[in-house]
A protein has these predicted regions:
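Transmembrane helix-loop junctions in multi-pass membrane proteins
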Residues: 68-77, 84, 212-222, 243-260, ...
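Membrane-interface "cap" regions at the ends of multi-pass membrane proteins
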Residues: 33-72, 101-106, 110-138, 306-310, ...
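Transmembrane alpha-helical segments of multi-pass small-molecule transport proteins
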Residues: 56-57, 61, 137-141, 169-217, ...
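C-terminal membrane-solvent junction of multi-pass transporters and transport-like membrane proteins
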Residues: 136-141, 407-419, 444-530, 558-559
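Membrane-embedded translocation segments of transport machinery
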Residues: 47-55, 225-389, 393, 406-408, ...
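Transmembrane helix-boundary motif of multi-pass solute transporters/channels
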Residues: 56-93, 297-299, 305, 314-316, ...
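Extracellular loop-to-transmembrane helix junctions
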Residues: 78-106, 200-201, 450, 530-540
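Inter-helical loop and helix-membrane interface segments of multi-pass membrane transporters/permeases
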Residues: 2, 45-49, 77-81, 111, ...
Length: 559
């Protein structure tokens, strides 16, 4: 079990890393060397903001996609579902689901922005001349907003643990059980010797919310783009430094295995896993979530493009940047170092317990056992925080853009209103966290809801608007011609793929989740409360869409 990379392991690692590196270098070389075209058509519609630079746009899009899941969720899923063999369904999903949907969302976003719409209610109504379109599009505002309500809370943990690492607060807790108590005390799940008040949690949560507010209030080019230009290079440098440090650990004196065995555990293929439908489903789900598809965010960010700004090369570059962070960096840090110190058997148990146990309980124990552990621990959690804040700022953007575009509010008023509602909802998440409130929201908004929305989106684009028109729109001003086979993929393969994923998740997960199977009776009121928040925020968004279009119709009649 503690063997290093086998021949097949090396082959899968080389193929995955090589493909991603070649495509990433190709994309960025095309982006950086491409000369800006003149006379690219309409520059603004209704005075909407724009991206100052192309590289800033790509880094912001990549920052939206690169989040906690790249460094925690991916390695756990890959290690548990066939190792190197997992990359076969993973890359199939990237080819047939991820990249096509990325191009679709970039195209829909740019098309909507040219006509003054920065969110999916307006965008869908342009593609489908039916009143239902704008109400279905409301999910592209409500879902990311619901996600950011709890995502910001998790994000604040990473900031707190970066501080605790740098100051050595948890040093001395040399086993996972003690670190688990430390985490629960910080989260206020329990009172213990480590934390006896809410103050530390609330301080780091307040700092996190303020930083999100600051960058959003500054706008597109002066806020979000600046954050991406600073945050993304720092994140990638930190990730590379940590990956190199892990690879040079060898066999730690205090460990029970080696990093080589960890890489073997991560990459040696178990081909028997490929016969399990669940593995293919997990791979599709990972691609779907890692690229932030079905959230309405890519659409909103792309709406700040000009009419003939490229979306094909930009979309592929965004995807490859995310894959570099996930497969090469994320796949090298957490699992290999866990195997080196805990061995394969215990690492499997850690992986089965979930990504957060790996990130917040196991790795802090390891940082205490390596030279300069405080520095590397602080760097790890700061990396997660940067990944988190670039994503949370993006998640909040659709709600702000909707109020700006459809109600003509000033950005300050829109940001203030959105954050007031967000803070009120986050208070409930924090207060009821130990009763499963966050997990319930995460399933319905952050898992199931996104699959539903993306399925609606691909059907509207490929079948109602039509692939022929969509293909033409996608290539307007394109710096890269998409192979024509993707016409077929967009019309048939991707929609069927999405329907299969949606059907499978409904059968395997959603029904049992709805019936609260396995949940303690004492938790039921809180879980229903989370569902009430989920449904309530969607209904409020639908109402806001109705009010916006009623206002538009009245103005049209009066003119």
């Amino acid at each position: 079990m503690n063997q290093g990379l086998t021949f097949w392991g090396w082959l899968f690692l080389a193929a995955a890393w090589g493909t991603i590196l070649v495509l990433t270098i190709y994309c960025f070389s095309r982006v950086l060397l491409h000369k800006k075209k003149k006379g690219t058509g309409p520059v603004e519609t209704g005075g909407r903001a724009q991206w100052a630079t192309r590289i800033g746009l790509i880094l912001a899009m990549a920052g939206n996609a690169i989040g906690l899941g790249n460094f925690l969720r991916f390695p756990v899923k890959a290690a548990a579902n066939g190792g190197g063999a997992f990359m076969i369904p993973y890359f199939c999903a990237l080819l047939f689901l991820g990249v096509p949907l990325m191009w679709v969302e970039w195209s829909i976003g740019r098309h909507g922005g040219v006509h003054g719409h920065g969110t999916t209610p307006g965008m869908f109504s342009l593609l489908w001349k039916h009143p239902a379109a704008r109400y279905l599009g409301a999910l592209g505002i409500s879902l990311p907003f619901i996600i950011v309500v709890y995502y910001t809370f998790i994000e604040s943990w990473t900031l707190g643990f970066s501080w605790f690492s740098g100051t050595g607060k948890y040093f001395g807790l040399d086993n996972r059980e003690a670190m688990g108590q430390f985490l629960k005390g910080y989260q206020r799940v329990e009172n213990n010797q480590f934390f006896s008040s809410w103050l530390p949690l609330l301080v780091f949560l307040a700092i996190t919310i303020f930083l999100n507010y600051y960058f959003l209030r500054k706008g597109i080019s002066k806020g979000i783009e600046v954050l991406a230009k600073i945050g993304m290079p720092v994140l990638l440098v930190f990730g590379i430094v940590l990956a190199v440090r892990v690879l040079t650990l060898g066999t730690p004196a205090s460990g029970v295995s080696s990093v080589g065995a960890g890489m073997g555990f991560m990459w040696n293929p178990d081909f028997s896993q490929l016969g399990r439908a669940t593995v293919w489903l997990v791979a599709a789900g990972q691609i779907f979530f890692t690229l932030s598809l079905g959230q309405g965010i890519i659409n909103t960010y792309a709406s700040y493009l000009r009419e003939k700004d490229d979306v094909t090369l930009n979309g592929l570059t965004t995807s490859m940047t995310n894959e570099f962070a996930e497969v090469i960096l994320g796949g090298t840090i957490a699992i290999p170092v866990a195997v080196a110190f805990f061995g394969v058997v215990e690492t499997k148990l850690i992986a089965n317990e979930g990504a957060f146990n790996l990130g917040f309980q196991s790795l802090p124990v390891i940082f205490q056992k390596i030279p300069m552990g405080q520095i590397f621990g602080a760097m790890w959690f700061l990396l997660l925080f940067i990944a988190g804040i670039t994503s949370s700022v993006a998640l909040t953007s659709p709600a702000v853009a909707f109020l700006e575009d459809e109600f003509k509010w000033k950005r300050t008023k829109a940001v203030n209103t959105v954050f007031a509602v967000m803070v009120a909802c986050t208070v409930l998440v924090v207060a009821f966290f130990k009763f499963g409130f966050l997990d319930e929201l995460d399933f319905w908004a952050g898992t199931f809801g996104l699959v539903v929305f993306a399925t609606i989106e691909i059907v509207i684009f490929s079948w109602i608007f039509g692939v022929k028109k969509g293909w033409k729109d996608m290539h307007l001003g394109a710096d890269m011609k998409v192979p024509k086979i993707f016409k077929f993929i967009l019309k048939y393969v991707t929609p069927v793929y999405m329907l299969v994923v949606l059907g499978a998740w409904t059968y395997q997960e959603a029904i049992g989740k709805f019936l609260m199977k396995g949940e303690e009776q004492s938790r039921h009121p809180y879980l229903w409360g989370a569902r009430a928040m989920f449904i309530g925020l969607i209904l409020v968004t639908v109402l806001m869409v109705w009010l916006a279009w009623r206002k538009k119709n009245k103005q049209a009649v009066s003119q």
